[in-house]
Amino acid sequence: MIKILFICHGNICRSVSAQYIMEDLAKKNGVELYVSSAATSREEIGNDIYPPAKRKLKEKGVPFSRHYARQATMSDYLSYDYLICMDENNMRNLNRMFNNDPDHKIYKLLSRDVSDPWYSNDFETAYNDINEGCKAWLEKLS
C-alpha cells in the first residue's frame, strides 16, 4: 500500500485538510492508500484542526476526526513513500530536516504554492487548491 504524508508548517490547516481530502477521494475511488499529515515546525504540536479549516471540510462534506498536530520525523521519512508539501518553504525545511532527500520522496502538492489560510484567511481557495492537487496525485498513483 502506498503511504503518503502531507506536510505544511503547523499541521492544523493545509496538510491535515489534504490528509482528509485524500482519504475521502481514495475511498470514493476504491484506491487503497495510507495517508497522514505532519508539520515542519513544533509550534502547533497537539492542537486540533484549526476551526475555520474544520468548518470548510464540514461544508464540503469531507469526513474528519479529532486530530493532534505533530512534527515530521526521520522515522516518517523512512516509512512513507511520498512526503507532499504545500509550499516551497515546507520543501526547504524538509530537505534541511532530511539530509536533502536522498531517497527522492519530497514533492510539492501543486506546481504553485498552496496559499496558507492561517495568514490569508481564504479557506475556500486553500480547499480548492488542495482538492485539485489531491485529485491529480490520486490519478498519478492509481
Per-region residue spans from a language model:
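Conserved active-site segments centered on acidic
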Residues: 1-78, 139-142
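Phosphate-binding/catalytic loops
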Residues: 82, 88-142
